[in-house]
């Protein structure tokens, strides 16, 4: 599950 990480990374 990298959805949470993706969101954070993309949010940056």
From Swiss-Prot:
Locations listed in the record: Secreted
One GO CC term, this protein: extracellular region
Keywords, in A-Z order: Antibiotic, Antimicrobial, Bacteriocin, Secreted
pH dependence comment: Optimum pH is 6.8.
Keyword Nucleotidyltransferase: no
GO biological process, one term: killing of cells of another organism
Temperature dependence of activity: Optimum temperature is 39 degrees Celsius.
Role according to the record: Oxygen labile bacteriocin-like. Has antibacterial activity only against strictly anaerobic rumen bacteria.
Name of protein: Lichenin
Taxonomic source organism: Bacillus licheniformis
């Amino acid at each position: 599950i990298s959805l949470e990480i993706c969101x954070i990374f993309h949010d940056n």
